[in-house]
Amino acid sequence: MSLMTQAWLLDKYGPRLNVDNLAEVLGMARATINNEISDGSFPVPTYRAHGKRWADYRDVDAYLDRCREALAA
């Protein structure tokens, strides 16, 4: 867990990120994210609330950490 990344995500997006925020942070197209969520292959857990799809900032941070570790290996 990177506290710097968590602090940055929380400051910029708040405690949860919508699909547009995820697209910006992960450098993915919104449609790709929606497709991966639909087929169950999106690497960050998401949930629906108030008609929108959300991801917790801690889960996004954990995914970014896994990516960083994979690049370092």
Which residues make up each language-model segment?
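Polyanion-binding surface elements
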Residues: 2-35, 66
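Non-membrane alpha-helical secondary structure
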Residues: 1-2, 56
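Short helix-start
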Residues: 16-20, 43-68
